[in-house]
Amino acid sequence: DAIKSVWKLIRSPGGFARDYVLGKRSAQMHPLGLLLLMIGALVVLLGETQYLVPTLASEEAQRMFALVREYSKWSFSLGIIAIYASAMLVFRKRLGYNATEILALAVYIHAVCIALQIVNQLPLLVWRAPEVLQWHRKWSPWTMGVAQTLIVVFAFRQFFRVTRWREVWKLVLAGGLFIAAKWGVQQLYARAVVEIVHWQMGL
């Protein structure tokens, strides 16, 4: 059932979320359960590929990284905030959806984005050379950023039924707001993590 739900969600994230909020929940996996499944799979894969493990010379640097990694576990959910904010700002009054239903949409979309990250990591299970990993770390954030924005816009179009060409600007605006909100949330979270780690280490 989980595999079927993931496949249906990937094919039509907005339609999947719309069916859920309109009451067809027996055939849909709960958004939180699906999100936790995706995050768990991504964490396991990142550990296998050693994607987030840098080469650190000193013991102090290793301790600092361990603390940063511990706090960064919550960062996998930051995209939900950006998706939710952009949807509320642009489409909040459309079709009568309430805040909770739009939050469910945001969780489902974020689950698809994480599924895309999982696919993006799979080649590193085969090509493990350090130069390949370095190249992947350099370019992946850009390609994934574009792909995730397209997923968000595609899902918004389905969920909010944006079918008229004269309304396309709303999708473009929502995509731009998503990019800005995601960048802002990540910057704030990163700064908060650094400050907490510095405080714990007495720096």
Residue ranges of model-derived segments:
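Membrane-proximal intrinsically disordered regions of secretory-pathway and membrane-system proteins
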Residues: 1-203
